[in-house]
Design a protein with these regions (language model features):
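A residue-level marker of the well-folded mature domains of exported/periplasmic proteins
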Residues: 1-267
């Protein structure tokens, strides 16, 4: 925030890239992926691919409690999962804070913070692994079987998947991810991770350059929403995201030139 304020004082137009600068009115524009849509896509995938029946064990994990995007990702996921939690399709089994709020569709920032504080992975592979191990150790067989797991990104997804895949009482798991990391694409091909949300940084970069050019030309950049950064509503341009599964890895990532087929085995 301090750097943005210094730039603003010099008459510079400040464009936040991917991460929103919070707590200052020195931000003019924001270019980002639709973080809410990322979480909603993760949650919807779990709903669409959950085993039949009700009372399906649901394990919730989130990013860092210090990261504004982690809140938006989780909020997006909650927006689609909450009705299915409230009607008994899913049963939250690793967060009593989330259970206490399971009948509430719209959570306040404080309520989100309470849940995320309990299920945070800090965006760290080892933290996610330890938390998953602790959750499975604390739970009995009735909270295992065929389960669904909301993992916030690819690194944490792989860590959690590694833990769940070695528990003899977990017969299957559906798990989300985000970022289309090479290691997770291989996991998806191998059936160890269910999906990832692909955020094409080439498109994000192009959108940010277009915004900067508009500013330099004295024009008002194209925006499609606003994000509140705790000091103002910042005009923003959101870049679309793509759900990637084993079925569309080739078309989404190889044919588009993002990765090469030789980067993976089993394609």
């Amino acid at each position: 925030a301090a750097a943005a304020e210094t730039a603003k004082a010099e008459g510079v137009t400040v464009i936040a890239y991917d991460r929103l600068i919070t707590g200052t009115d020195a931000v003019d524009y924001y270019v980002t992926f639709d973080s809410f849509a990322v979480g909603a896509a993760q949650g919807q995938f779990l709903i669409d691919n959950a085993p039949a029946g009700s009372g399906i064990p649901l394990y919730l994990y989130a990013g860092a409690a210090t990261d504004n995007n982690a809140f938006i990702f989780f909020q997006g996921a909650w927006s689609v999962l909450q009705p299915k939690i409230a009607d008994g399709t899913f049963k939250i089994v690793n967060s009593d804070e989330a259970v206490a709020l399971q009948d509430k569709a719209d959570l306040t920032r404080e309520e989100l913070s309470t849940i995320i504080g309990q299920i945070t992975t800090d965006w760290d592979f080892n933290v996610a692994k330890s938390k998953a191990e602790a959750n499975l150790t604390a739970n009995g067989a009735d909270a295992k079987g065929d389960v669904c797991v909301l993992a916030p990104n690819d690194g944490t997804s792989r860590a959690i998947a590694d833990v769940f895949s070695t528990d003899k009482d977990v017969t299957s798991y559906v798990i989300s991810g985000q970022d289309a990391e090479k290691a997770s694409i291989q996991y998806i091909i191998d059936g160890k991770q269910s999906m990832t949300v692909f955020k094409d940084t080439r498109t994000l970069a192009a959108d940010s350059v277009a915004m900067a050019v508009s500013v330099l030309n004295g024009e008002t950049p194209a925006t499609d929403t606003t994000y509140n950064n705790e000091a103002k509503d910042v005009p923003a341009k959101q870049t679309d995201v793509v759900v990637v599964t084993k079925d569309n890895v080739k078309s989404a990532l190889i044919d588009s030139g993002y990765y090469e087929a030789g980067d993976f085995t089993g394609l």
